[in-house]
């Protein structure tokens, strides 16, 4: 089995500067940084466009290590031939180390962005840096899956295949209330709109991070753990919160509040596989996942039950044949 250190050695990390980027609201930023990683070699058609591109998209945690796609790449029975495809991972708009409130130091003055902006950010980068004819496949998880679904209906001819895990087409009522509450708690801090980063904002991140990430604890752990074990999980969230910026967190949370694409998914042309983890507490399979069968024309929806520990993606081995058949 290839280790995570081996795969990180295979990945090449770099940055690219977009001369400018225009948001949907008309605001423009100049000298916009895009952090990205690649693996493999691109293949080109007669027009010089890349034909073997596979895009891996981040989860809410926004790191490749936390993305379930790494298990596909790390698997000794790798479902893709590494020699045949060119893999690209792009840190999204709004997330360090790409253009974000914290990286630009714009904080609350950073332009309000949408999932459509995040799609255009990645698409502009790919067109400028790695001009492609069509993306062979996008593999995405959680918030990265939301973004990829938006991409699929905005630019339906851009991709052939789409695989999304732990996604929904609209934020369910209880999750909407949580996201809205986080927004209101942050905005209630009188220092949020100050030009100087106040210490009270740093202290605020700890309870907010617990509230925002509690849904990342799988059902098998949350429902069957005693309070001491749950306190251990929360301690881990405390450690993570020390490295999170409240403005970055605020803007990503805003995306969730406004997410509802139910009436747009009929425009998706990509052959789509939706994987619903029934052990994920944030999603209800019948409410959030199953409707994709009717919402996306060429789609397959499968339930999986992935028992796992905190910060583990679980064992996908029994589903590898499904993925292989779908992606190849």
What are these language model-derived features?
Residues 1-53:
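Catalytic-loop region of hydrolases
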Residues 37-102:
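N-terminal cap/lid subdomain of alpha/beta-hydrolase-fold enzymes
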Residues 116-137:
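Conserved acidic catalytic loop of the alpha/beta-hydrolase fold
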Residues 133-174:
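Conserved hydrolase catalytic core segment
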Residues 163-192:
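Flexible "cap/lid" loop of the alpha/beta hydrolase fold
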Residues 183-275, 283:
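Alpha/beta-hydrolase
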Residues 271-300:
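Conserved loop-alpha-helix segment in the C-terminal half of the alpha/beta-hydrolase fold
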Residues 297-328:
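Catalytic active-site module of serine/aspartate enzymes centered on a nucleophile-bearing elbow/loop
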